[in-house]
Structures are given as structure tokens and as C-alpha cells.
UniProtKB/Swiss-Prot annotation:
The keyword Signal applies. A lipid is attached at C25 (N-palmitoyl cysteine). Its main location: membrane. This is Putative lipoprotein LprB. Residues 1-24 form the signal peptide. Residues 26-50 are annotated as: Disordered. A lipid is attached at C25 (S-diacylglycerol cysteine). Transmembrane segments: none annotated. GO terms for cellular component: plasma membrane. It is found in: Cell membrane. InterPro entries: DUF3558 (IPR024520). It holds the Pfam family DUF3558. The keyword Signal applies.
Amino acid sequence: MRRKVRRLTLAVSALVALFPAVAGCSDSGDNKPGATIPSTPANAEGRHGPFFPQCGGVSDQTVTELTRVTGLVNTAKNSVGCQWLAGGGILGPHFSFSWYRGSPIGRERKTEELSRASVEDINIDGHSGFIAIGNEPSLGDSLCEVGIQFSDDFIEWSVSFSQKPFPPPCDIAKELTRQSIANSK
């Protein structure tokens, strides 16, 4: 009996302790000073950039020619991105195009700043963004990602090699980005 009372007391104490936190999350519609009221309607739409064709309008052949990797397979192809892998396997070089609609480029840049050797501003054909370089001790600069902002959207090309020799990854990423910008509508 004593155990049951103690358990009940602990449960009630826990609920009492959690009540202020849960109550703070309620949508009571209270407009008292200090309450946060959104300045725009919840259903307001963002400003979208141009339309990008599948794979950024870049062909499998172009990716193969620029990367100089034979046997590339487009293993993921949909309306917002594509991924090319050597022989279709996860080991080895990989290349990808991604189109982020209504997503902040700043969050992606921050992730890059935390995980890459360097991240710099870039402008390609009048469009601003970032270029991130990743390196491996045995390979040097083997990864390059270019993200370019378009209103509330952004695109990103990622080029990553896994063994030498390979062409400069940032030259490839910049050229693929240029082609995608040219193919946008």
C-alpha cells in the first residue's frame, strides 16, 4: 500500500512539474503583452525561384564527361534531385543535384561550415551562394559543393571523388551549376 501511495505521489509531482511547460505550448489565443503574434498569415506562400528540369537539366553523359568517371549510373532520379554513383554502388565517387524549394540556404551553408575545410561566397551568372570544399588526408580537396540561392529556393551540386587521379572537383561543380542555371525556366 505504501508503495502505491509513493508511486501516485511521484506521478502527481511529475505532472505538476510538467504542467507549466505544457501550458506554455497551448494555443489559447491570448493576446496579452509579450505574446507572439505572427505578422503574416500561416498560409502565406514563399517566393519561389525558377523551375529546374529533372537533374538540373544535365544529362548523364555530361556528368560522365565532366567527372571522367566511366560506368556512372543515375541511381536516384526525381523532380527535386538526381544522384550518380560509379557502377551504381555506394562505394566510390558520387555526384548529385538537389533542388530545395522553400528551404533556407543559410541552414545548408551553416551545416557546410561545420563539416567542410572551407566555405566561401560565390556568384555564378549573377546568382549568389556558397562553395564548400572538403578534403581527405590521402586525397586532398576531393569534395566540392556549390549552393545557389533563388528567392526562397536553392540548388546544390555535390561532386565527390574517392581515389586519385581526378579532375578539380570545384571546376566540375561550378560548370554543372552554370549548366543548371542556363537550363532553368
